[in-house]
Amino acid sequence: MSALGTRRNFLGRINLALTGFAFTRALPFQNAIGVQEPVAEPVDYYDKLGITKRINAAGTYTYLTGALMSPSVQAAVAQAAKHPVFLEDLQKAAGEYLARKLRCEGAMVTAGAASAVTLATAACITVANGSPASHAMPTDMNGLKNEVIVQKAHRYDYDHAMRNCGIRFVDVQTLREYESAFTRNTVMCFFYNAADAGQISREDWIRVAHAHGVPCLNDAAADVPPISLVPSGFV
């Protein structure tokens, strides 16, 4: 057989394989060997696992599994589960869409409040140390900027979400202490929106930080709804 014939046979097999791949993608509920899988009957997995259902009269708290999803959101999740996509494409497009809806500079979908705090802290460290956005956050913090200013009354159970990034907390209590706490190593100021304690208001916290050119992270994860509070988190 000629080399040309061999190449044609090879390309023909490749084309057939790609056609089969495309056909398989068009049938998302078929398994790997092309057998149609039966539709699963609804299962109450909380009952199956022996978990007691609760009435959430508190708010959108992580320990209460956040908030119930509306039927439209459940339908969107079910639809999205039918097709694979590149995760980076999804993150970028979803973030841009949410930013437009929320009228803010940028947005990112995270796995929850703790991961949001970690990612925001990592972003502030990366920017403060002059690392390009395309590079990973520094893992060796020796000699790098890593200080996060926080009110002592705002230290809470999610401190570890920031500590995971290798930061060092600088605790303050009064406005005077806060104004004097900034150094060349300050990368972020943290504010816990749900904390009633603390001598420094959110408005003063943001004002002083921005006067020093330092970004603020406001954990307001459990403070929406009402939707009118959304802008308070973008500082």
PLM-predicted stretches and their roles:
Residues F10-I14, V39-I55, G59-Y63, G95-G106, ...:
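Conserved PLP-enzyme active-site core in the AAT-like
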Residues T52-F86:
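Glycine-rich phosphate-binding segment of PLP-dependent enzymes
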Residues A76-Q79, A93, Y97:
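A non-catalytic, amphipathic alpha-helix used as a structural packing/dimerization or gating element
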